[in-house]
């Protein structure tokens, strides 16, 4: 599966400022060449170090991906840091030629997708400012082969660049839902298989079989801690949730009561901004 990111990249003049208003490089849609355009995740990531910021609500995530697509395919929206707040004034679907930079564009997309303006930020303080909105989970470090979902915001760990995933894995999948609980919050089948060679040998990347194993066995095996999905470790979750320990008891060293902690996070914890890694 090819993952795509959208972002405000650079002016047609090859500089951060001084370009004509609007996207001078866009020639067609979907736009993969413009000042504001899409590119593959691998070309977006390059060699830099990144954080991933994920919306708490699936609907917001899907809306963020759609918002960035609208922006990337809008020929009236170009790149120029000297007029970076133009997109805030006119919006991502503007019919008036205007400008943005990478951070102001993400701000505008968040506003379009959620109805909330998180305020001005740059790549230096994006994690803090976006996090204060209450709309997103705690930022996590990007790792190679991490499952990136449509709507995920990816920002450099230091001053640099920021964008939104326009085409990634869907958080609306029903394949990881069991008895009304979405275990996709704690289980990434590909990650689970890759981190557990015995399971990969037995099941390959079969989502149904890996979910079944997780629910029957893996969730209660300490040897699987930190090996179900990149951004959730049940041991960390339990150790930083003393209120849950009072209800469920301490997490046993063999992991045999792990299921209740996994299930709690899927049903409640992921919306409560609890620490998971």
Description of each model-found segment:
Residues 142-147:
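Short, surface-exposed secondary-structure edge patches
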Residues 150-152:
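Loop/turn positions that initiate beta-strands
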Residues 177-277:
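Charge-rich, low-complexity intrinsically disordered regions
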């Amino acid at each position: 599966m090819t993952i795509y990111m959208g972002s405000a990249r650079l002016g047609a003049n090859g500089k951060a400022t001084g370009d004509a208003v609007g996207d001078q490089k866009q020639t067609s849609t979907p736009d993969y060449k413009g000042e504001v355009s899409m590119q593959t995740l691998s070309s977006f990531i390059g060699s830099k170090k990144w954080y991933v910021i994920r919306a708490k609500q699936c609907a917001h995530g899907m809306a963020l991906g759609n918002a960035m697509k609208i922006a990337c395919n809008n020929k009236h929206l170009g790149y120029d840091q000297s007029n970076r707040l133009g997109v805030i004034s006119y919006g991502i679907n503007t019919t008036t030629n205007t400008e943005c930079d990478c951070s102001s564009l993400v701000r505008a997309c968040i506003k379009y997708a959620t109805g909330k303006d998180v305020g001005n930020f740059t790549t230096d303080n994006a994690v803090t400012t976006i996090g204060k909105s209450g709309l997103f989970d705690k930022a996590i470090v990007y790792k190679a082969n991490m499952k990136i979902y449509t709507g995920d915001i990816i920002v450099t760990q230091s001053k640099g660049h920021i964008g939104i995933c326009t085409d990634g894995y869907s958080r609306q999948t029903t394949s990881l839902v069991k008895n009304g609980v979405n275990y996709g919050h704690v289980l990434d089948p590909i990650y689970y298989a890759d981190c557990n060679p015995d399971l990969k040998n037995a099941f390959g990347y079969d989502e149904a079989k890996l979910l079944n194993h997780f629910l029957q066995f893996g969730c209660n095996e300490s040897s699987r801690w930190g090996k179900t999905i990149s951004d959730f470790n049940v041991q960390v979750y339990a150790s930083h949730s003393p209120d849950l320990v009072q209800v469920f008891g301490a997490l046993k060293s063999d992991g045999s009561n792990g299921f209740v902690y996994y299930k709690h996070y899927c049903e409640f914890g992921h919306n409560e901004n609890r620490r998971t890694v």
